[in-house]
Every structure is written in structure tokens, then in C-alpha cells.
Amino acid sequence: MANRERDRELLIPVADFGDKDDGSSSKPSSSSSASSSHQSGHETLSLFIRGWASKKFMTGCVILLPIAVTFYTTWWFIHFVDGFFSPIYALLGINIFGFGFLTSIAFIFLVGVFMSSWLGASVLNLGEWFIKRMPFVRHIYNASKQISTAISPDQNTQAFKEVAIIRHPRVGEYAFGFITSTVVLQNYPTEEELCCVYVPTNHLYIGDILLVNSNDVIRPNLSVREGIEIVVSGGMSMPQILSTLDKPLASIGNES
């Protein structure tokens, strides 16, 4: 009897249990793969939506930032200029916004007319004589005067005469600068005409002064104000095509 029961135990099909286990385990694996693919699809969609939203948000910032800065600067400037004469109108009982600003603009215009005369120039020279005797104030005045003279519409007193392009610092590289004056270098028995070119290195009031032969100076078709805008904007307002004012200098720019 014992041998028969042992033989029956050996004949028990063990593979059926394995098949049942495989079937039961395959169902969770297939469901887990489906859920993982569904989850990856959600992640891809969310990443796409977030990327699209961030891109459109940055586009809106790029468009609105210069507009906001322009309006804010203009509004601040109007309030700043209006503040010079608005207290006077307030004492007179006139509280209309803009009167101080219009009065300041008219005052600046009258100052320009007066300083263009002989009497105004004499008064200005006398005031500069007193300012230049002050230890610390004269340095501030000289620096601010040089910047204002650079954009002056008067060609006789303008610090920046012309916009210039020179080879600097190596052959094949060009630097953007301004011609401030000309000088004659006497190297006996010959003389060489040099242009004093101011090349800004940091903003507009810090730079290098280079003496360059007048034949090596390329003069583009840019005004001084356009050149200042190019320097202040870091070259972003540079036109795509530059042409020279005279043909002989154009050939210099085309050399290797």
C-alpha cells in the first residue's frame, strides 16, 4: 500500500501548477505595461504643454518688456521734469498735471536760444570758470559735458566727428569707433596724417584712444547718433549692410 501511494504521488502533474502560475503572472505584467505606456503618454503630453506655454510666455515677455520699459521711462521722465515747476503752480493754486512739464520744455528751449547768443556764451564761460575751480564737482561736470557734447547737434563743438571702422586688434578683425580729431605726425622728412579714433570698450564713456593713419580709416554711412545707438545697444542695432562714404576706402575693407 505504501508503494502504491508513493507511485501516485510521483504521477501528480506538477506542470499544471506552473502553467497556472504563468497565466496568473502574465495578466499583471500585461496590465502593468499598459499602465506604464499610458503614464508615459501623459508625461509626454504634459511636457509638450509646459514647453509650449513657457515658450509663449517668454515671447510675451520679450514683446512687452521694451514697451513697458519705454512707458515707464517716459512716465518717470515726465514726472521728473514736471517736478521742477509744478510746486510753483501748486503755490498759485493751479493743480493741472502737465503744466510743469510744458513749462520745463519751454524753459529748456529758451536756454538753448539764449546760450546760442554771445551773451549766453559769456555767461556759460563764466559759470564754467567757477565750476572748474571746485575740487570734486569739476570732474563730474567735465565727464557729463563730454557725453553731452558728443551728441551735440553743433558740428563745431561735437566731440565725435564721424563714425569709423578700423582694423583692431588683429588683421581680419575690425573695431567700431568715433573720430574725435586729426593730428599730423612729423616724422622728418615726411609727415603722416593720423586720425584720433575713440573705441568704446565699456558703455560709451570708457574706451581706448587709437591713432590710425587716415588712409586706413573706413568711414561707413552712419551718423554719430546711429553709432552711439549701436554702442549702447551692444551692436544689436547694427544694420545688416554697411557701405562706405567714399570708394577708395571701400577697397580697404575688401582687402584680406
Swiss-Prot record:
Pfam name, any one: DUF502
Keywords assigned: Membrane, Transmembrane, Transmembrane helix
Extracellular-facing ranges: 82-93
Superkingdom per UniProt: Eukaryota
Cytoplasmic-side segments: 1-60, 115-256
Family: Belongs to the plant COV1 protein family.
Protein name, entry field: Protein LIKE COV 1
